[in-house]
A protein has these predicted regions:
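Non-catalytic, topology-defining segments of multipass membrane proteins
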Residues: 2-194, 198, 238-275
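Active-site-proximal inter-transmembrane loops
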Residues: 139-146, 202-228, 232-235
Length: 275
C-alpha cells in the first residue's frame, strides 16, 4: 500500500512538472528589485529619444531625415510604449508653435496653470487633436505608408497591450502591471507635463522669443535633449538644440551617430553642420 502511494505521488509530481514546463515562464527576470527599475529607466529613455528624434525633429520640424531602417524601429517602439499616432502628435505640436503661450496653444502653463499642465497635460493633448480641422490643417506630411494605415494608426491600442504582455512575462503578475503603468504615464508626464509645462515656466533663457519657453537644464540627457526648450523655440528647425558651448544635447549625438552609418541626413542645424 505504501509503495502504491509513493508511486502515485511521484507520478503526480512528474505531471505537475510537465504542466509547469508547458506554461510561459512569467516573471522570467526574477524578483530582484533593481531589474524592473533598470528596465523602466532604459525603456523610458528610449521612448524619450524616439519622441524627440522621430516625432519632433524629423516629422514635426523636418530638420533631419531618417532612413527607413532607422525610422521604422522608432515608430514601432512608440506604438508599443505610447500608442501615439504620429499625425495627432505632430498636429498638436505644430498648433503649439503657432500659438505658443497665446490663446490657441493646446498646452500653455500661462493659460491653464503649471499644475494642470504637469498633471493633466495628456488631457489637453487629446482635447486639441479632437478639435475639428486640427489634424487636416496641422498634421500634413506625416507617414501614410502601409504600416501606418494598417497597424500604427487604426490599431494604436494594440501596441500597448503587447507591451503589457511583455511586462507580465518579464516581471510577473504583480510587478509587471506596475512597470506597464509607469510606461503608460511616461510621456504624458515627461513630455506633455514637464517639457510643455516646466519648459514654459521655470529655467533660464538664452534667447528672447515671443513665448515664455525656458531651458530646464544645460545638460540635456534624460529627455533626449528636450530640456533645451528655449533654444528650440528660438530656432525650431534646427536639428540640434544646443546653443552654447557648455550645453549638451544627447539627441544631437544620436543623430550624428546615425549619420555616420547613413541612417540620418541633417537638413539644417544651428551654427554649422556639426551643430
Amino acid at each position: 500500500m505504501r509503495r502504491r502511494f509513493v508511486g502515485a505521488l511521484a507520478v503526480s509530481e512528474q505531471i505537475s512538472r510537465t504542466e509547469n514546463n508547458a506554461m510561459p515562464d512569467f516573471g522570467s527576470w526574477g524578483t530582484a528589485w533593481w531589474k524592473p527599475l533598470l528596465f523602466i529607466i532604459v525603456a523610458g529613455h528610449i521612448t524619450n529619444v524616439c519622441v524627440t528624434l522621430f516625432l519632433h525633429r524629423s516629422q514635426m520640424h523636418r530638420s533631419v531625415k531618417f532612413h527607413y531602417l532607422a525610422a521604422l524601429p522608432m515608430r514601432l517602439w512608440l506604438w508599443l510604449s505610447t500608442a501615439i499616432v504620429t499625425k495627432e502628435w505632430v498636429a498638436c505640436h505644430r498648433k503649439h508653435h503657432a500659438f505658443a503661450d497665446r490663446d490657441g496653444d493646446p498646452h500653455s502653463p500661462l493659460l491653464e496653470g503649471l499644475r494642470n499642465i504637469v498633471l493633466k497635460g495628456a488631457f489637453y493633448y487629446r482635447a486639441a487633436v479632437r478639435q475639428p480641422g486640427v489634424l487636416e490643417k496641422y498634421g500634413k506630411g506625416t507617414p501614410n505608408d502601409w504600416i501606418e494605415r494598417a497597424l500604427l494608426t487604426p490599431l494604436n491600442w494594440l501596441g500597448i497591450l503587447l507591451m503589457l504582455a511583455v511586462d507580465l512575462y518579464l516581471f510577473g503578475f504583480f510587478v509587471g502591471p506596475i512597470v506597464w503603468g509607469v510606461q503608460m504615464i511616461w510621456i504624458p508626464f515627461w513630455a506633455a507635463g514637464i517639457i510643455n509645462g516646466v519648459g514654459h515656466a521655470l529655467g533660464y533663457r538664452n534667447f528672447e522669443v515671443k513665448d515664455e519657453s525656458r531651458n530646464i537644464s544645460p545638460i540635456a540627457i534624460w529627455l533626449g535633449g528636450e530640456e533645451l526648450h528655449n533654444n528650440h523655440h528660438a530656432d525650431p528647425h534646427s536639428a540640434t538644440f544646443k546653443a552654447k558651448w557648455y550645453e549638451f544635447d544627447i539627441g544631437w549625438v544620436y543623430i550624428r551617430l546615425l549619420s555616420l552609418f547613413g541612417l540620418a541626413k541633417v537638413q539644417y542645424a544651428r551654427g554649422s553642420s556639426r551643430g
